[in-house]
């Protein structure tokens, strides 16, 4: 009996972790789409698709490179399409957006951030500089990075409704994250 209760508690705990980490919303018309920096094209591809569908007039990719590496880690997937020598995550993400039909004038620039909280901080500086009043925003990030990204952007945009529209570049989803060590490490690393 005690063993069964522990199993139920464990499963309930894992379900709660899942519900917390994997934030997701239906997109609505917004003032901007945010893309926190990374080396995967999928989040920028998702942002470009939402842009082309008319969800927002601007996209703000954000990122210099990871503070832990000290340089741009390089393109992590789809190198045959997006390969190149990029100095920053922003430069890479901008290229992905351009190749996916987003005009240059719709792409704002933030190329100093080295971790997620800085993505939010410096994005706020950019939107303030451009006098963009952000009442609603869409956030395109990794599936399991959704809650942390959302929390940081909410700190900097407390009056803004932020809709999370994640992409899944590495196959880690709400449905399968418990099946691999990589998935478990990625998700539990977010809490």
Which residues fall in each region the model found?
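A structural signal for short, hydrophobic/glycine-enriched beta-strand patches
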Residues: 5-183
